[in-house]
Amino acid sequence: MENSPRYREATNLIPSPRCHNSNNSCGMSSSSESNKPPTTPTRHVTTRSESGNPYPTTFVQADTSSFKQVVQMLTGSAERPKHGSSLKPNPTHHQPDPRSTPSSFSIPPIKAVPNKKQSSSSASGFRLYERRNSMKNLKINPLNPVFNPVNSAFSPRKPEILSPSILDFPSLVLSPVTPLIPDPFDRSGSSNQSPNELAAEEKAMKERGFYLHPSPATTPMDPEPRLLPLFPVTSPRVSGSSSASTS
């Protein structure tokens, strides 16, 4: 009876104790597999990583209907929009390895720490801008009580002295009066000319169109400059040969 085919089939259906300890449902898998119809191969993800390559290559098998969803699932960011979170992924798809997806390497946002140097520089720049605008619209009036030396720190002088020098501004200090003296740079000698010479000079200006300034006799005259010949009359070769022949 032990050699009959029915007894052999019954012994094959008895689950093994090893399988019973690991999973209770694996004992009936052999009988259920014979009754299941042939199913289509599920989509799987294979990862091929080379030694020393931090970015492994992922191969995904998908059809045209779910290709877009698989690409978004593998390359999408960790924070998806609200309308994308409501869509549930297809249970037939295998979840990719979280170590191979870039979403696991999310960098935390950097907290903006206020810099003291930047705040101080911006405050100083704002103060400088205000100071420039106030200097553009500045109007100085010595009679104004604002510029009174009692109320201001420009000068500790008496308030009855109303002059531009009370503000201690160099540009407002009055310049000294220059006395009216003969021009030392006037070399025309018009002050030493007689009325006859002035009349002759005016006549020459009307007739000839130039000024008549006679040079004083006391001016030392330089000797006439020596004029060098531009084109020599004799050749140096000829002069050298003639001198050699005479010697």
Curated annotation (Swiss-Prot):
Motif VQ positions after renumbering to this chain: 67-76
Region (Disordered), start-end ranges: 1-128, 184-247
A GO CC annotation given for this chain: nucleus
UniProt biased composition (Basic and acidic residues): 200-210
Modification Phosphothreonine occurs at: T178, T219, T234
PTM: Phosphorylated on serine and threonine residues by MPK6 following treatment with the pathogen-associated molecular pattern (PAMP) flg22. MAP kinase-mediated phosphorylation after PAMP elicitation causes degradation of VQ4, allowing WRKY33 to promote transcription from defense genes.
Record-given protein name: VQ motif-containing protein 4
Keywords: Nucleus, Phosphoprotein, Plant defense
